[in-house]
Amino acid sequence: NGLTFGNFCDCLDLLQQSKQAAAEKDESTINEIFQDITLKLYRYKDPEKIPAVPSLLAIHAVNFFSAVWEMVLSGPVYIGGEAIDFRILFQKLASEDRKADDKTGWTGIVFEVAASGVFGNKKEVDDTPFWDVLLYLYKCKFEYLHQKRNKK
């Protein structure tokens, strides 16, 4: 799949916006958001001639994105035959280990990864494949948890 980390972050933001639009029963905004998500997930050969997105494709694109995200949040994902449990990224830390939350969410994470230089600057992080950045975040959290455990 060709999902970039930047498009992943955009899709998550759009999904949140769609929940708000659904609460307001704003069908035209929901349709527009679903179209935007679809265009972030699918690549057209000629970006100058992007066709109107069929509603059925938009619904399936959102369902697929949501299902993959749910898979990441709910259990191990097999990558290269290895079970990677991304849930460690979302576990709450004990209160003594918890840093103040700056409330920047995924945007803040992009800047943190860019600051590390592993994938380059923010634009380059945004253009990096989603799974590469997620694996890097997993590696960082895994190492942090094991360092913490070894200090005790």
Mark where each language-model region is.
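An amphipathic, hydrophobic-aromatic interaction surface with interspersed Lys/Arg
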Residues: 1-152
